[in-house]
Amino acid sequence: MHDRLSRRAARLIGRAAPLLSPGRQAVLSLSATLLSAAALAQPAARAYAIPAGSLESVLTRYALESQLMLSYSAADVAGRRSGGLTGSHDAASALRQILAGTGMRASLQPNGGYLLRVAAGADDAQTLPSVTVTGDGAETAWGPVAGFVAKRSATATKTDTPLHETPQSVSVVPRAQVVAQAADSLDQALAYTAGVMPLDGGALRNISTGFTVRGFNITGSAPLYLNGTKLPMNSMSGAMEPYNYERIEVLKGPASILYGQAAPGGIINLVSKRPTAEPLREMEVKYGTWNTRQLAMDFGGPLTEDGNVGYRLTGLARDADTMVRHINNDRQSLSGSLEWQLSGATRLTLLGGWSRTDNPYDVGKPREGTLLPNPNGAISRKVFLGEPGFDRFVVQGGHLGYLLEHKINDDWQVRQNLLGYNHRANSNNLYMMTSSVDAANPARVERLAVSRDDTDKGIALDNQLLGKLRHGRFEHTLLFGVDASRSSLTRDQAVGLNAVPIDVYDPVYGSTPTLDPARRSISRARQVGFYAQDQIKFDGRWIGLFGGRYDRARTEEAPDDGRQDSHAFSPRAGLMYLFDNGLAPYYSFTKSFQPTSGMDFGGTPFKPTTGTQHEIGLKYEPPGVDAAITLALYDITQRNVVTSDLANPGFSVQTGEVRSRGAELEGRASLNHNLDVVAAFTLTNARTTKSTRGDEGARPASVPRSMASLWLDYKLAALPGLSTAAGVRYVGRQESDGVTVPSYTVLDAALRYRLQNWEFALNVKNLTNKRYIAACPYACYYGDERNVMLTARVNW
């Protein structure tokens, strides 16, 4: 047997210990020790900042951070307090400080873990009720991750499921990686993730979030999810701050089985920070390139003596410029949660957030002078082609919701999740008329003025019944759900065609465009879905994942009086096998649907596009090593794609088809407790396979054929508290309307030092100050120049 089985046994013992007699608990504890076949390497010295608190909470947090196995009696630790742990320690030194004054001692065990017991009663330790705590065992699908390697997720199943037992590819970016890489936007947080590419190369991170996943633009009807619930339908409703989230997860491939309408490439799910059992106090200050100044805070802990009510409050304020003149990156955000354990069986968590962004919009650069030659030379990375006195983008809004959980008995529970949101966005922008310069004057571009006032609001409700059944050698985790959502986008838009052209090499500002009267449009969407899922385990080795969902959706467009009613059934099937050596091959089949607005020449509303994916893969978790590797091969076909109606110019037909086939390899590891590794490699062959435009074989924009990345984060044992890191990101060539965006390679680096409860960091992105085009979906966007960020963080 290997370490995975010992961890399972440990978790079962931890849950069952209070229900068993002391003698049976002792036997179970001894059995768990015997199940560990691979001795765990002792952690090297590393820095900790664990505040004082109950001994149980300090031990739990230490196990989470060190990934060390600790076994102790629940009765022994009850009522005892610890002074916490600060400074740099190896395992023995850390436990001496944690246990100082508690009357307990730690003994090294043959399996590499430690047995904790009362010093005076050591001879009777074999009769004590035993609880085993490990870093792996402490993780849940909605909680923090110890280090860089997540072991559980709910994004693919809506249940707390090990990633190693999920027959579909899921990438999890934990909080530790976001901090180590100083990622202040979603595109930066996902830069080392296989198969994910920002639409604009990250150039618009100050106002919006858009990505392609597995070759498909996922920004349309379902841009982002928060705790499994869809966020606003408008992709311009503002950027998201990684600081507010515990983990960022990407489910690859169709996700309609659980989430309804969505693009076939996948979804991005943000998991909120939740209340903590012990007091949490963190302040963070950043200063860097482009006059970046940022202050952030993170507070949490219990509000009552019995710990039944807890809170979490996270806030951020940033005042910053960007690489492009006249464009800033200012933002304020506040997120909070309140958790109330109403009874032993019922828990209510309130979640809310507010944010405000006030930043102009980078309209990009023309192709001539960036991607293509221009007789006047290369266009500066810093030039702004809008009007400083006219261009603006202000978005303000928030969300509020709750998560309600009630346990009916040990096997069944009901859950209800609700999320409501309201965003208001006001923008004025001068866009380029085309993606090219004026043919008569290659230094000039024609411009178009657009003013928008958007109100984006909605509400979503998800009701779930979750249960477990066991019969013979079969174990079932059953999920039944009904969800419904309503959303609306009201837009007042005015356009001005007489904007003054601008010289891209010597811009002269000051003109004010004249706008036509604003026109109002209203988009409304409703959806209700019924879904069922069965996660089956047979003999502890075979994993089956089967389910289906039926959706009814309605979209309405005014003033065009357009209305579309659609329905779809979305099945999923998956199968995998768990080998003792940590290998787990799998196969999955999934489908998606996505409503399409508009009508054909005959007035018939368009059908939803549909996506079908076949995926085979191999997951590997080496026994005794904190690592996870996933290899996935996929084939996705999207049908009912809108293409030109050649018989009726100005209209469209749904005879188009897009196919994406590719391979993804992603690995994460924490080795010897001082080296963290994140590696990814992507091959994507996305093509238009059916079209009336004659563009069969064309690749979609912002979809590189290949991508690769590697991040190494090393804690220096010789210099306790000091860490260094380096990263490399390669993005292969992209195609866009017949032109090619060259490949590029960017280097990143970091240096960190922890001194007791303080941490100081220096992060450098684009270390060599490489000049490159990041993306060219319409206009062209340069990648960021070299930028440096200094961070000071304190926990107390």
Predicted segments, located by residue:
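Conserved C-terminal beta-signal and adjacent last beta-strands/turns
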Residues: L478, A701-W796
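Face-selective signature of the C-terminal outer-membrane beta-barrel domain
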Residues: L400-N422, R447-A558
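Structural signature of Gram-negative outer-membrane beta-barrels, strongest in the C-terminal barrel
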Residues: Q341, D456, E475-L479, D483-S487, ...
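Outer-membrane beta-barrel translocator/receptor signature
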Residues: Y243-E246, I257-G336, L342-R347, G398, ...
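Gram-negative outer-membrane beta-barrel transporters
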Residues: D635, Q654-D737, T791-N795
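Membrane-embedded beta-barrel scaffold of Gram-negative outer-membrane proteins
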Residues: E405-N409, Q413-L419, H423-Y431, P585, ...
